[in-house]
Every structure is written in C-alpha cells, then in structure tokens.
C-alpha cells in the first residue's frame, strides 16, 4: 500500500464493508465482580473502559456528523451513516454490560456523570475541528486496541465467554470503520498539525489519566489493597512484551503522527475475516 497516495487522496480509503449488525449477548456467565482471573485491577480497568464507551461513542458520532454536509464522496457519506449505526449499537451493548457490572457491585453512575459533563463542556468550548481531531485520535487508539483484542487469545481467554465475544464483536466493527473519521478529517479539515497535537495530548495525557482515575475510583469502592500477584497479572496484561495491551502495539499507537499515516496502513482485514465466522452465531442481520 502506498501510504503517500493515501494521504494525498482525500476520499474514503476503507478496505472493508462497514456492516450493520444486531447482536445479542446473554452475559449470563459474568457472575463475579472480579471476572478476569479473579483480578480486581484488570476487572476494574475494563469496567471503566466499558463505562466510558456510551458517552464517548455518542461524542464520536456527533463530532463526525458536524461535517456530514461537507463530504463530497458518496462512499464516505454512506460510511459515516454505517459508522454512526455501529457506534450507537456499541453504546447500547455496553450499557447492558455496565448494568450487569453494576449488579455485581461496581458503582459506575458517578464516573458516567463526570464523562458526560466533560463532554458537554467541550461541546460548548471546543471548535468542531478540534472535536473531530479528538475523535480521529480516539478511533485510532480504539482500532489499535481492537487489533490486540482479536490477536491476543492468550490474554482474552480469561474473560467470561460472552463478555469476551462482546469485546471481540466490538473490535471487528472498530476495525471495519477505523478510517471513517480520519477520512472525514482529511477531506473537511486537513490540518495535520492540529491533529497530531490533539492526538499526542490524547495518547499521553487525557486517555491514560482518565483511565487511571476511573479504575482507581472503582477499586476504592472496595477499599482494595492489591497483592503482589494482582499487580503482576495487571502489569503483564498491559505491558507484557509479547502480548501486552499497551506494549505489544506501541509502534502502532505511535505510527499515527508519522508523515503519510493512514489507519489502513495496518491492514488487519484478515483478522476481521477470521473472527466474523466465529462470532456469526451472535449476529442477527
Ligand atoms: Fe465503538
Ligand atoms: Fe469507533
């Protein structure tokens, strides 16, 4: 793939159809508060990610739709609609998961409110261009995480099956639509300096800080003191050289600010094809 051509050609460069699916996960097997290997830290970390999805994804949709009228490429316009459909359904499914997590003892209401207030403030204070740049940034992090979720079975196998499949379905769709916000930005804004600045702020500051604070807040509800083994599992989960969620894909997180970058420079369409078959029993088209 010629990355320079992609950067110069400001229309849809998607590699996969962005499918509209309906899914159903019972979540009957999510029965423990510390559902991931009995580990409170990994479990709270994913609970806080899940709480962040519904407000976050609502903002992704809004910020892309702000530019809908300026999109000249009919393929990209159609993709925006399918992207919005997918993100809305992710939110719906994560709300069901969050409800389940609340039943298991996580009190997520306060965190949800903080997210919503922060986004409402930004809606008033930030320019549409900056909001779209943040969405493009978050979509790259999400798509990179999605690549990890589909390629790291050893780590993923410890989630309860239905929750693992929910996360992997979400991952498939994040990869399918990973270039939509980017292509909209390229066509309608095109300011790479702004984009790189917003991305660096998101990657090194906003995202890790927000996740650390929300994970800590959830753990504090139990007056939790981590054991050495808890710490080891959590550290391995994030930073194992071979398949850590952060460390193993660090070059892909960083690739974003390189000249000529496009989300499909990492072609993971094969991963999606492999997983679609496994998860198809959950899909009701
Ligand atoms: Fe999503
Ligand atoms: Fe997304």
Describe the role of every protein-language-model region:
Residues 2-285:
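Non-heme di-metal
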């Amino acid at each position: 793939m010629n990355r320079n051509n992609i950067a110069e050609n400001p229309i849809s460069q998607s590699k996969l159809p962005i499918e509209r699916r309906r899914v159903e996960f019972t979540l009957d097997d999510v029965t423990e508060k510390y559902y991931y290997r009995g580990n409170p830290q990994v479990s709270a970390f994913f609970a806080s990610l899940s709480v962040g999805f519904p407000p976050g994804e609502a903002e992704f949709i809004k910020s892309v739709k702000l530019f809908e009228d300026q999109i000249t490429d009919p393929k990209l316009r159609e993709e925006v609609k399918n992207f919005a459909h997918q993100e809305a359904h992710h939110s719906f499914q994560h709300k069901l998961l969050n409800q389940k997590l609340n039943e298991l003892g996580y009190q997520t209401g306060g965190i949800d409110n903080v997210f919503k207030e922060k986004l409402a403030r930004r809606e008033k204070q930030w320019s549409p261009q900056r909001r779209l740049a943040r969405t493009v940034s978050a979509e790259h992090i999400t798509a990179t995480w999605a690549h990890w979720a589909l390629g790291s079975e050893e780590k993923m196998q410890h989630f309860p099956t239905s929750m693992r499949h929910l996360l992997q379905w979400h991952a498939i769709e994040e990869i399918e639509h990973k270039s939509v916000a980017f292509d909209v930005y390229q066509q309608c804004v095109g300011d790479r300096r702004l984009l790189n600045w917003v991305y660096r702020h998101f990657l090194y500051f906003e995202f890790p800080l927000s996740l650390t604070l929300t994970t800590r807040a959830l753990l504090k509800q139990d007056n939790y003191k981590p054991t050495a083994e808890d710490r080891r599992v959590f550290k391995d989960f994030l930073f194992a050289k071979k398949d850590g969620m952060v460390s193993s894909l660090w070059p892909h997180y960083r690739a974003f600010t390189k000249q000529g970058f496009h989300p499909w420079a990492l072609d993971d369409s094969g991963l999606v094809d492999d997983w679609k078959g496994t998860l198809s029993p959950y899909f009701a088209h």
